[in-house]
């Protein structure tokens, strides 16, 4: 089965959401998210973004589906749908099966899991994650959704070429300090 990358912004306490939206507004993080999830080395391919229904519904209608990527929504409530840029499936297993077969096995370069917490947890539990691209925000936002399943003892921090030659650069925007980190899941740890 194919592996995926996970991309997430998280506060100091592991919070990733509050009242159905991101509890912070960091333009540089949004730009990073778009750049990383769209970037392909083979220009004949594109990436897929995999998300849960709540994550899908948190995206403004005018920005759905996320441009330049195949959007796959996991939902037990939405009816199954399929178009060129948007597919609804009822399970992670169904999504991964779809992406592991033609035409997607040949046309999708990277699968990006963009959340939310339940979808992140499921992929981590099923050992489907290769890399984690983490925006670490150095503040607690009293979030109501947390990512609890990240076990950094089973990962190693790697160079994040998408940001700079330094993997530990701290940025600041709107009074918030944050960094972009990249972690590789170590299989036999």
From Swiss-Prot:
CDD domains: DHFR. GO terms for molecular function: dihydrofolate reductase activity; NADP binding. Its EC number is 1.5.1.3. One of its GO terms (biological process) is dihydrofolate metabolic process. It comes from the Eukaryota. Residues 3-185 form the DHFR domain. It holds the Pfam family DHFR_1. Substrate binds at residues 29-34, 69. Pathway: Cofactor biosynthesis; tetrahydrofolate biosynthesis; 5,6,7,8-tetrahydrofolate from 7,8-dihydrofolate: step 1/1. Keywords: NADP, One-carbon metabolism, Oxidoreductase. It is an enzyme of class 1 (oxidoreductase). Belongs to the dihydrofolate reductase family. Key enzyme in folate metabolism. Catalyzes an essential reaction for de novo glycine and purine synthesis, and for DNA precursor synthesis. PANTHER family: DIHYDROFOLATE REDUCTASE (PTHR48069:SF3). This is Putative dihydrofolate reductase. It comes from Caenorhabditis elegans.
